[in-house]
Amino acid sequence: GYLLRHKKSGARIALLSNEDENKVFYIGFKTPPADSTGVAHILEHSVLEGSKEFPVKDPFIELVKGSMNTFLNAMTYPDKTMYPVASCNDKDFANLMHVYMDAVFYPDIYKQPNIFYQEGWHYEMENASDELKLNGVVYNEMKGAFSSPDDVLDREIVRNLFPDTVYANESGGDPDVIPNLTYEQFLDFHRKYYHPANSYIYLYGNMDMVERLNWMDEHYLSHFEKIDVEANISLQEPFAAPREAVKPYSITENEPLEHNTYLTCSMTAGDVLNREEYIAFQILDYALCSSQGAPLKQALLDAGIGEDIYSDYDNGTRQPYFSIVAKNADASRKEEFLRIIDETLEKLVAEGLDQKRLQAGLNYYEFKYREADYGIFPAGLMYGLQVMDSWLY
């Protein structure tokens, strides 16, 4: 593999040349949100609504219908936005690259304000007597996301662990805040972050890499001069003492209030740039909580703290974090939940972890990475997403 920098524009490029015919390309941008208007998410939707060389209403839908792609999507993360495609056909792959590069650098959003109103938010009323109501693709999508207890929990964990960083903001957009976003702010976000100097381009598979690099240079990258893009993602300063947060969430009329609380204990876990820690925490997660009869999970289940106990090691942010969650628990048992976690971990520190369980974790992850079976997703795509876990920082 090669890591390159385009001299004129400053674009970062990663090349993984191999025999895999399922070729993958993505272009990503560091997009730290300054608020919860969801501007990064709305922009992700909007750039795929037509561009300079592809002025059709919805090129994304045209590609879904007419391309031989093995993957086609765009994703907004807490601090980055990514546009990946994959195909086994050389001509199709080149076309997908063309559509996506044109979309991110020359979208129709500057000529067609209605793209913003359609994808972001707008007021509408059918008749003069009707009540004025809010609508918009991202607005409605995030209303759905904010009604899911699991999504609410994930969001609150990140917001409370990293209150002084960009992660305190909702990159997808908070439905209560999305209507604060103006069209001009939306365009400013594109002008600031969608520049090659702030881009991460990834090519994987069996292709003529030199030809692809020359094509990108000639058609797009050479049209831009390198600039400094301020997109710093700061680290959260450690707290002086553990903090507590309570977040209500809505339930249906038929759901009981009892045994319907989520209890979680979350902590930052090392540095995403430390590869050994990154792997060690995955194995620790397996040994402590994820595997059958894992000691931390078992201790909480034996105490009847919740109907389900699960853990999550998330390394998709500047600082990875580890969470232990008790689902369908009682709020009154919060102190007991924390005490069992502390006592179990202290005991494991004193007596050591079961070597067989650790070895099983090592074997599990070694097999997983060697097998590289990602189901419907191309292996090259999953490698590329993993690359961004550290490349971005």
PLM feature segments, named:
Residues G1-D20:
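N- or domain-start disorder-to-order transition segments that initiate the globular core
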Residues Y2-K7, R243-E253:
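Short acidic-hydrophobic surface loop/beta-edge motif
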Residues L3, A14-L15, Y26, Y262-T264, ...:
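Ordered hydrophobic segments in well-structured contexts
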Residues K7-K8, E19, K30-P32, C88-N89:
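Secondary-structure transition/turn motif
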Residues E21-F25:
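Short, conserved catalytic-motif segment at the N-terminal edge
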Residues G28-G38:
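Short pre-active-site segment immediately N-terminal to the catalytic Zn-binding motif
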Residues P32, S46-A240, E253-A280, Y286-Y393:
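Charge-rich, well-structured scaffold segments of protease-associated domains
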Residues T37-E49:
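Active-site recognition of the HExxH zinc-binding catalytic motif
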